[in-house]
Amino acid sequence: APKQGLNPSHPVSRFGAGNLDTLKKPGLLDALKRFYTSEYSANRMALVVLGEEPLDALEQLVRDRFTEIPNRQLPSSATELPLFDTERLPFVVQSRPATEARWLTLLFPVPDTDAFADRDPLRYVGHLLGHESEGSLLAHLKSKGYANGLSAGESLSMTESRSFSISISLTPKGFAHRDEIISEIFRTIRLIETRGIDSWRFDELKMISDANFKFEEESI
C-alpha cells in the first residue's frame, strides 16, 4: 500500500510481487527473458566476496562462477526521477490486510545522505524514535494502550532519493486514536530537532552496533 504514495513514474512504484493468478498469464516467460536480455549485464553488477582463502583463490572462485554473465555494455539503470511526487503529498493510503493486523506507517522523503555515510544520520534518528526505554515514544504509546511495537529507519534507498519510515503496530484502541498517535510522532520529532544530538546516545548506538557486528551469526 505505501507504494501508492510514490511517484507513479518511478520504477519502485510498480507492483513487485506475484501469485498463482498473475503468474499464469500467457507470455510471461517470454517477457521475463526479454527483460533479462535488455536489463541484465555484468557492467551493471557488483560483487563482494568474503572468505578465509587466499586472494588468488577467491579471485579464481569468482571467475569460475561468474565469467559467463554477459557484458552487454548497458548504460546505468539509475533513474533521476524523484521517488516522491511532491505535488501529491501528503498522501494517505488505507488498506485492509488479509490477517488480523493494525499498522500505522508514516513515510517521509528525505535528502540523499551518502555524503554523511560515516555518521549515518538516518540510523541515529531511527534509534531515537524506535527506543523502548522509559520516556520514549513507544513507552508513552504503550502506557496509553495504543501500541504493541514500533520501528523506525531508512526504508527505501535509491540514487538521489531516500525515504524514512516510522511503523507502529497498533492495538484496537490505538487504531481508534490514529490522529493522536500521529501528533505524538511529530511532537517527538520536534523534540529531537530542538534538543539536537546527545553524545551519550550516539555512543550508545555505537556500542550496540559494535556488539551486533561482533556477535553476528555467520550466514551461508
Which role does the model predict for each range below?
Residues A1-S77, L83-E87, V92-P121, H127, ...:
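Charge-rich, well-structured scaffold segments of protease-associated domains
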